Amino acid sequence: MNTLSYVLLCMLARKSCTGYELKQYMELFWQAHHSQIYTVLGKMETEGYVHFEADPDTTKKIYSLTEKGILAVSEWVLEETAEPISRDEFLAKIYVIALMEKSTVAQLFNDRRRHYKKRAAINKPKLEELETLQNDPTRKEEWRNSFGRYLIVKRRDDLCTQELAWCDWAEDLYHSSFDKI
C-alpha cells in the first residue's frame, strides 16, 4: 500500500466517511485529487481494508475500516516516518528577491499574506468548534476522537500566524537593506 492508502485509513479510524468527507479532512495536511482518493478506496475495498455501505437517500458510499484496516494502521504508525516533502513556489521566488523591482516584492509579500490570512480565516471556526468540544464535559468521547484533528488544526493555525509574522519581518528587512541602495 502507498502512503495515501494509510492516510485514508487513518481518517477512517476516526469515523466512517464518504470520499468527499475524506478529501475535506485530509486537506488539513495532505493533498490528493478526488480521483486518486476513489481509486485507492476501491483498491482497499477489494483488498479488504475498508468496506462501504451505500446511503439509499443520496447514493453516496460511506466507507468504514475493517479489522484488517485497523491492523494495517496500527502497524503503519509504528514505522519510521518519512521526512516531509517541502515545495514552495513562493520561497523559490524569494530566493531571487534581489533581482526584483520593489513593487514586485511588495506584491509578492501581499499575496503571501492574503493567502495565509485566508487560511487563518478557514482555520478559526474549526478551531473554535474543537475548543468548544474540548471544554464540554458531556462530550468527552467525541473530544477524544477529535483530539488528533485538533492538534493538526491548531498547528496549521500557528503556522499561519508564524508565516504572517515572517512576511512582516522579511519585508521590513528587505526595505532596510535595499531602500538605501
Describe these PLM feature segments:
Residues 11-14, 29, 53, 97, ...:
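Histidine kinase transmitter module recognition
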Residues 75-125:
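Amphipathic alpha-helical dimerization/coiled-coil segments
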Residues 34, 59, 84, 106-109, ...:
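Amphipathic, non-membrane alpha-helical segments in soluble helical-bundle scaffolds
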Residues 110-181:
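Mid-protein regulatory/catalytic core that forms ligand/cofactor-binding pockets
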Residues 1-90:
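Basic helix-turn-helix/winged-helix DNA-binding cores
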Residues 34, 38, 48-52, 70, ...:
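Alpha-helix boundary/capping detector
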